[in-house]
């Protein structure tokens, strides 16, 4: 057992430092092609690269371990200190991805066929997960790899709506203007704004506003973007109509949308992950997340799904991303125990 643990930690150290050295912000995933070709050859896992998104698929089987290879922008030089690995994506989500790759390798060596994916664009518009759902893939079970503290199993994510609003007005000299598009729209923003308060209440948050071209002329055009988040019990259409009613004189366009997801605690993946943690004397927690993940998309191609992964979720998107080799080992062990149970029951 100790020998296996040291093998996993040594391989995790090697692979994670290698992957962290490759800068892969969203839309730049092709930078990791040689890494996945090396993994394919070393671990004897068939490699497929999805053409539209440049997502990487390793192995074959009816069980999918799905994480993502892209990160938020901002390269952090990878390093290791006392079995703690630092770097952009160490937590979100190259750490979980490496755990999944090692688990898939070890499981396939045992004759348990598992597919693992390094999907593209999760930090943007999830084009990798979306392409996967269009490729006629269907899986008995999917585990999504995101940092969940190594103890938490995510059973619910909120949905999101990304809205562009374009408004127009007649420009006037600022010294004598009777109206002002910035002022008028600002009032409407305040009226429609819903601050993020708790999971069950929707939020409507302005994130971008652009207007004006000259110091002394009121704007003729204004661009506004809203990021809308809502739980599965909220009514999507009511939220959109509320914004439409407030901005009747403006054009409104949904530029991206991700549905909410909620799974039963009796879902086979949830139960197998729970038991896998208990076997390691780790107390599992079932949680829900205010953001979105590829789980929101991948629910379309399976009836059994949940999210779990190593890494402190509080460090996501920060310049302090770090993960320990012990955390990665727990992730590998949890994925393996869960999939072995699912495999036996299928």
From Swiss-Prot:
Q: Name one GO molecular function term.
A: cobalt ion binding
Q: What pathway does this protein act in?
A: Amino-acid biosynthesis; L-lysine biosynthesis via AAA pathway; L-lysine from L-alpha-aminoadipate (Thermus route): step 5/5; Amino-acid biosynthesis; L-arginine biosynthesis
Q: Which reaction does it catalyse?
A: [amino-group carrier protein]-C-terminal-gamma-(L-lysyl)-L-glutamate + H2O = [amino-group carrier protein]-C-terminal-L-glutamate + L-lysine; [amino-group carrier protein]-C-terminal-gamma-(L-ornithyl)-L-glutamate + H2O = [amino-group carrier protein]-C-terminal-L-glutamate + L-ornithine
Q: Name the EC number(s).
A: 3.5.1.130, 3.5.1.132
Q: Where in the cell is it found?
A: Cytoplasm
Does the entry feature the keyword Plastid, yes or no?
A: no
Please list the residues that bind Zn(2+) 1: 68, 92, 146
Q: List the disulfide bonds.
A: none
- List the GO cellular component terms: cytoplasm
Q: Which cofactor does it need?
A: Zn(2+); Co(2+)
Q: Which InterPro entries match?
A: ArgE/DapE_CS, Bact_exopeptidase_dim_dom, LysK, Peptidase_M20, Peptidase_M20_dimer, Peptidase_M20A
| Record's cofactor remark | Binds 2 Zn(2+) or Co(2+) ions per subunit.
Which GO biological process categories is it annotated with? arginine biosynthetic process via ornithine; L-arginine biosynthetic process; lysine biosynthetic process via aminoadipic acid
Q: Which residues bind Zn(2+) 2?
A: 92, 123, 317
Query: What keywords are assigned to this protein?
Result: Amino-acid biosynthesis, Arginine biosynthesis, Cobalt, Cytoplasm, Hydrolase, Lysine biosynthesis, Metal-binding, Zinc
User: Gene3D superfamilies per the record?
Assistant: 3.30.70.360, Zn peptidases
HAMAP family in the cross-refs: LysK (MF_01120)
Family assignment?
Answer: Belongs to the peptidase M20A family. LysK subfamily.
Q: Which NCBIfam families match?
A: dapE-lys-deAc, PRK00466.1
Q: What does the UniProt record say this protein does?
A: Catalyzes the release of L-lysine from [LysW]-gamma-L-lysine and the release of L-ornithine from [LysW]-L-ornithine.
Q: What is this protein called?
A: [LysW]-lysine/[LysW]-ornithine hydrolase
Lineage in the entry? Archaea, Thermoproteota, Thermoprotei, Sulfolobales, Sulfolobaceae
Q: Which gene encodes it?
A: lysK
């Amino acid at each position: 057992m100790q020998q296996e643990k040291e093998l996993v930690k040594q391989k995790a150290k090697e692979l994670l430092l290698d992957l962290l050295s490759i800068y892969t912000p969203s839309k730049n995933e092709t930078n990791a092609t040689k890494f996945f070709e090396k993994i394919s050859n070393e671990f004897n896992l068939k490699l497929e690269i999805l053409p539209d998104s440049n997502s990487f698929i390793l192995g074959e089987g009816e069980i999918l371990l799905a994480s993502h290879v892209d990160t938020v922008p901002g390269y952090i030089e990878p390093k290791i200190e006392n079995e703690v690995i630092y770097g952009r994506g160490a937590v979100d989500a190259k750490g979980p991805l490496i755990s999944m790759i090692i688990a898939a390798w070890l499981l396939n060596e045992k004759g348990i066929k598992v597919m693992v994916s390094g999907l593209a664009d999760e930090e943007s518009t999830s084009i990798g997960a979306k392409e996967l759902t269009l490729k006629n893939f269907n899986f008995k079970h999917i585990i999504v790899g995101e940092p969940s503290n190594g103890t938490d199993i995510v059973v619910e994510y909120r949905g999101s709506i990304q809205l562009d609003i374009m408004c127009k007005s007649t420009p006037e000299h600022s010294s004598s203007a009777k109206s002002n598009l910035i002022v008028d729209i600002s009032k409407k923003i305040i009226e429609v704004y819903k601050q993020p308060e708790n999971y069950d209440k929707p939020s409507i948050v302005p994130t971008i506003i652009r207007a004006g071209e000259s110091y002394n002329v009121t704007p003729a055009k204004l661009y506004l973007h809203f990021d809308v988040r809502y739980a599965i019990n909220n009514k999507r259409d009511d939220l959109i109509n509320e914004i439409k009613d407030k901005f009747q004189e403006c054009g409104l366009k949904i530029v991206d949308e991700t549905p909410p997801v909620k799974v039963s605690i009796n879902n086979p993946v949830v139960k197998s992950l729970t038991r896998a943690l208990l076997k390691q004397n780790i107390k599992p927690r079932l949680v829900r997340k205010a953001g979105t993940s590829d789980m929101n998309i991948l629910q379309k191609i399976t009836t059994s799904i949940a999210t779990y992964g190593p890494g402190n979720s509080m460090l996501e998107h920060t310049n302090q991303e770090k993960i320990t080799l012990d955390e990665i080992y727990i992730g590998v062990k949890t994925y393996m125990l869960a999939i072995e149970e699912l495999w036996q029951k299928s």
